[in-house]
Amino acid sequence: MARSIKKGPFVDTHVQKKIDNALEKNDKKVIKTWSRRSTILPETIGLTFAVHNGRKFVPVYITENMIGHKLGEFAPTRTFHGHAEKKAAAPAAKK
């Protein structure tokens, strides 16, 4: 379900402070965050976030087509190792 327009997009306050500092200083350093729930805003284009996926920090470079999505969408938390292979059936026993 979409968020109400009157509420506006959600960004954690500590992440917003880091964004403001980076824009003020014109700094391109990686912004480290655990806040996967923060929405990507237009002012963050060109910045790189290190988003925690539960085990490590995944670097996410913000582009135009990411606006409106959440940071966590670009840092997968699960690794897929593939489905188990079916073992070859044993040769039929002879009578």
From Swiss-Prot:
- Per the UniProt entry, what are the Gene Ontology biological process annotations, in alphabetical order? ribosomal small subunit assembly; translation
Q: Name one GO molecular function term.
A: rRNA binding
Pfam families in the record: Ribosomal_S19
Swiss-Prot/TrEMBL keywords: Ribonucleoprotein, Ribosomal protein, RNA-binding, rRNA-binding
Q: Does the keyword Cell division apply?
A: no
Tell me, what does this protein do in biology? Protein S19 forms a complex with S13 that binds strongly to the 16S ribosomal RNA.
Q: What is this protein called?
A: Small ribosomal subunit protein uS19
Q: Does the record bear Protease in its keywords?
A: no
> Per the record, what is one GO cellular component?
small ribosomal subunit
Name residues in a coiled coil: none
Q: What is the organism field in this record?
A: Bdellovibrio bacteriovorus (strain ATCC 15356 / DSM 50701 / NCIMB 9529 / HD100)
The entry assigns this protein to a family as follows: Belongs to the universal ribosomal protein uS19 family.
